[in-house]
């Protein structure tokens, strides 16, 4: 059975929830039959300051994102790179969910981003002992694969090498474990922030002496409503009040 062509994908994000968190880095490899044909790598502006724990986990800082494009500016180039290829990742459904949400909200109404996937986490769970940790960093250490964790392109490269290792070890005996499967994630297209919401948030921030740490124009309508509620309730407050 041929490995075929696929895009190895890894994202760094502001958190774990695709409905509320944002992509901050994309790393992808176009591969075929064990060879890397092309790469795609970019930072992405989330439109807001990073939380300290995000920087601690990813190593990505606000300064690194200062001149990064917003997702809308790289969406078409990314789509061209992805083509209709199978998506390969470690816990691929998580990255697929973030990517689908971002793409659906930037493309014309009716756009569908449906793909098949391969998951090194799923494959590892099938063949490795239960006591063996299955995080990407744990598996690369287990198989002695070079890896600089928590940066998108480095994680994509490590995932590719992990897949190649798993293929060499287990594909001949269990080829069914390496058959792509449909990825499923339901996402509702979001409504962009309304101008009156931006004005309202700016007024609330000014009244309370709170600095604006995000690009309000990048919010969705629901995000703007949540932000206004957080300001009113005191969840978000001026630095002098903390």
Where are these regions (language model features)?
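Conserved non-catalytic scaffold segment of RNase H-like nuclease domains
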Residues: 1-115, 129-150, 176
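Active-site catalytic microenvironments for nucleophilic, acid-base chemistry
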Residues: 102-105, 126, 142, 165-169, ...
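A short, structured active-site edge motif that brings together acidic residues
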Residues: 112-124
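Acidic, divalent-metal-coordinating active-site segment for phosphoryl/phosphodiester hydrolysis
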Residues: 153-164
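Acidic two-metal-ion nuclease catalytic site recognized across multiple nuclease folds
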Residues: 162-242
């Amino acid at each position: 059975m041929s490995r075929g062509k696929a895009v190895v994908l890894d994202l760094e994000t502001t958190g774990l929830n695709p409905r509320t968190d944002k992509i901050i880095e994309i790393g992808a490899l176009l591969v075929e039959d064990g060879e890397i044909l092309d790469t795609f790598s970019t930072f992405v502006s989330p439109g807001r300051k990073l939380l300290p724990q995000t920087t601690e986990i990813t190593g990505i800082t606000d300064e690194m994102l200062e001149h990064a494009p917003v997702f809308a500016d790289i969406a078409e180039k990314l789509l061209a790179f992805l083509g209709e290829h199978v998506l390969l990742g470690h816990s691929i459904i998580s990255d697929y969910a973030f990517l689908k949400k971002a793409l659906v909200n930037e493309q014309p109404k009716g756009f569908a981003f449906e793909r098949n996937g391969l998951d090194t986490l799923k494959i590892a769970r099938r063949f490795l002992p239960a006591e063996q940790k299955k995080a990407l960093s744990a598996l690369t250490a287990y198989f002695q694969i070079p890896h600089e964790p928590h940066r998108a392109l480095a994680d994509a490269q490590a995932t590719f090498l992990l897949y190649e290792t798993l293929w060499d070890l287990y594909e001949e005996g269990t080829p069914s474990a390496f058959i792509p499967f449909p990825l499923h994630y339901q996402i509702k297209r979001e409504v962009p922030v309304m101008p009156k919401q931006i004005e309202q948030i700016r007024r609330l921030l000014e009244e309370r002496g709170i600095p604006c740490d995000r690009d309000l124009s990048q919010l969705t309508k629901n995000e703007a409503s949540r932000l206004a509620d957080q300001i009113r309730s005191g969840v978000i407050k001026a630095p002098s009040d903390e």
